[in-house]
Amino acid sequence: MGDRMAFRFDSGATWLNLLATRGTHFGEHPVERMPTVGRLVEWLDAVELRPVRKVSAADLELAWELREALRPVALATVDGVPPDSAQVKALGRFLDGESVSLKVTDRLVRTPPATATDALGRIARQAVDHLTGPEREFLSVCPEHDCRGVFSDPSGRRRWCPNPACATRGRVRAHRARKAQSE
């Protein structure tokens, strides 16, 4: 599987990594990294949220729906503007559901979600906590017009999302602009 299809787990939170399952979202050729139920299961495994029950095509549709409900709310939060009420309502429907129980083995662990819907609910709750709490101040958006990926940057020093392609394109463009000015 090519690098373009590889999952990204470097955005700073599970819900931000869910946003990254669709690359170059605003470009002419977006990259869907989670096109199948199998890929959704792989992603849920990687974020330790694989449900007990089998994941279905309807669950994949719900995962896409959550991702695309989160994106505009996150971008509005970073831009410091109120999100559209319809977007908030779309996100809100994921917040109902099971509660998380914890157990102790050799470490503190949460019980696996019963269904993919429950897993998506946990992700939605994490996102809402992040978007409404003090950590929202650490959210940044990649300036690349085709990316606009949201990521957490507690250091305040990142200019681009964790995708190396965005930083490379941005640096090359800046270098060419400086070179053109000096000529």
PLM segments and residue spans:
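A structural preference for long, well-packed, hydrophobic secondary-structure segments
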Residues: 138-140, 157, 176
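Cysteine-rich micro-motifs
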Residues: 157-167
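Short helix-coil boundary/hinge micro-motifs
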Residues: 1-141, 148-152, 183
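Short, cysteine/histidine-rich loop/knuckle motifs that typically chelate Zn2+
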Residues: 141-146, 163-165
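Basic DNA-binding region of bZIP-type proteins
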Residues: 165-182
